[in-house]
Amino acid sequence: MILLEGVKKSFGNKQILAGVDLNINAGSSLVIIGRSGTGKSVLIKCILALEKYDEGKILINGVENRNKNNKTFYDQFGMLFQGGALFDSIPIWENISFRLLQSNQKISRSDAKQIASEKLKLVGLNTDIMDLHPSELSGGMQKRVALARAIAGDPKIIFFDEPTTGLDPIMANVINRLIRKIVVEMGVTAITITHDINSTRIIADDVAMLDSGKIQWTGKINQLDKSENQMVDQFINGLTEGPISNNY
């Protein structure tokens, strides 16, 4: 379980997080929605201890994450970056198993390649691409390779940062459904940040809306369309009139 209580974060005089309270149940898939620039990525970085928050508390399975920047702490996480973030200079299988090869587990290259093969199959790719380089793959295939890398270490918690950015609608749906499949089959806790409502409907068990530095609404995915929250209604329907300012 991940618990956030009164988390605040500012950069200079600009407050990004103004007291975030959030409870993320173990094994659930939470999607954090909100317009661009509302602090979704900053919030994820605070959970990962990549940014130090100014006030509040973040507990991961009952342990506060402040100053937890050691390898053991990060081993519990997987991450699918917005741009994929694959290494162009190494083959696909090494991209997938990169973290395993850098770990203290002393895994052999042959074992790492076998794990990469298994993860490729999970994301619907053939293993005959393992010795290719990222530049030889399509954007959708690269995204699936990045997803395979995110699950290579069998993490307990996976973060998805705008997972369908830059993809056409068909491939976006492929990625959304793969994420949902992996979350269910692996039983992981998933946290996704997006402004894509279609992605939200496929991936989420629970939804939280972040705006003005705070969580404005939380609920189950089947409550999203009947939230009776003006901000949520404006956002999911793309309305120009409402409590959310369009001056951003």
Model-assigned labels for residue ranges:
Residues 48:
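Helix-to-loop junction immediately C-terminal to a conserved catalytic motif
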Residues 65-78, 224-227:
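ABC ATPase NBD coupling module
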Residues 90-98:
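Short coil-to-helix segment of the ABC ATPase nucleotide-binding domain corresponding to the Q-loop/switch region
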Residues 109-128:
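Conserved ABC ATPase "signature" region
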Residues 133-137, 141:
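Conserved ABC ATPase signature
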Residues 154:
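Conserved catalytic motifs of ABC-family nucleotide-binding domains
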Residues 158-161:
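Catalytic Walker B motif of ABC-type/P-loop ATPase nucleotide-binding domains
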